[in-house]
């Protein structure tokens, strides 16, 4: 019986994908789904593609090149487990993943939030940017579970009941950036019971050339558009205090072009609720002051 399905979108980093696969135990109750997003044959040897020689790995090759959101949605079609996890191809799981599988096989929870730590891929240095056990426990202890539900966007920072996402038809946005935000907010909204594990399960690697750190115009506009959608939803369910920080992406457009920035700023003012604007401005200046002091 398959208890856990893990979806890994991949594009052009086969060595890192192999490392990710090696970190996942070869258990009969674990299904691994790798969805290749039209990788370049000059970079990837498809005859020796990672996972092809492993019994619990299913490799799906797509030619559409529509990004991680499309790849994850494609992977969901093949899920057989009762729990769903995600990993990025350049990340990997800690040795505690076996413990996670043993501890939560029969859990009645809808979502298990997974602590992680962040490592610089080049230097191997531990970074402070991570979802710590202490922070998670504090949020639940102080009954701030909404912080997890509406601010924990990363799909790999949670383990989700498959029956729940199927019941509510929750899927990823098929956009070039921020495909996971809408998915995660909806998962947080519909989940009745949530919990956390009290140990590090996931190792996130920072690559500064990756999508997350790109100031590409298309990526920024995608993040802004998703932010508007999420903030409208949060406003409708009276959770606007967990707003998506769209202003940062609008301000980042200054580095691309002033005309584009002013155009998007006008749209931002028109589309964004006034209380979100005020909160965002306060947050922006608070961060500026903090950086000056530092």
Residue ranges and their predicted role:
Residues 68-72, 89-194, 205-219:
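Donor-binding/catalytic cores of nucleotide-activated saccharide
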């Amino acid at each position: 019986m398959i208890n856990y399905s893990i979806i890994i979108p991949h594009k052009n980093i086969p060595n890192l994908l192999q490392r990710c696969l090696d970190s996942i135990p070869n258990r009969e109750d674990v299904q691994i789904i790798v969805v290749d997003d039209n990788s370049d044959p000059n970079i990837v040897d498809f005859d020796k593609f990672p996972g092809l020689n492993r019994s619990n790995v299913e490799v799906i090759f797509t030619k559409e090149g529509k990004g991680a959101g499309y790849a994850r949605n494609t992977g969901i079609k093949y899920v057989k487990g009762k729990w769903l996890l995600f990993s990025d191809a350049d990340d990997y799981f800690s040795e505690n993943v076996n413990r996670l599988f043993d501890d939560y096989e029969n859990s009645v929870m809808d979502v298990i939030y997974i602590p992680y730590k962040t490592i610089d891929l080049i230097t191997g240095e531990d970074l402070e940017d991570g979802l710590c056990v202490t922070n998670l426990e504090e949020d639940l202890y102080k009954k701030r579970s909404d912080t997890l539900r509406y601010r924990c966007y990363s799909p790999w920072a949670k383990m989700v009941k498959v029956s729940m996402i199927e019941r509510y038809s929750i899927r990823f946005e098929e956009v070039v950036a921020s495909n996971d935000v809408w998915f995660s907010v909806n998962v947080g909204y519909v989940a009745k019971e949530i919990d956390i594990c009290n140990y590090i399960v996931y190792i996130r690697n920072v690559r500064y050339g990756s999508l997350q750190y790109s100031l590409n115009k298309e990526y920024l506009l995608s993040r802004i558009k998703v932010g508007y959608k999420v903030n409208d939803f949060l406003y409708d369910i009276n959770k606007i205090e967990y707003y998506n920080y769209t202003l940062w992406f609008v301000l980042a457009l200054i580095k691309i072009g002033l005309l584009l920035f002013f155009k998007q700023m006008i749209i931002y003012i028109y589309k964004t609720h006034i209380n979100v604007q005020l909160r965002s401005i306060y947050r922006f200046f608070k961060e500026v002051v903090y950086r000056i002091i530092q």
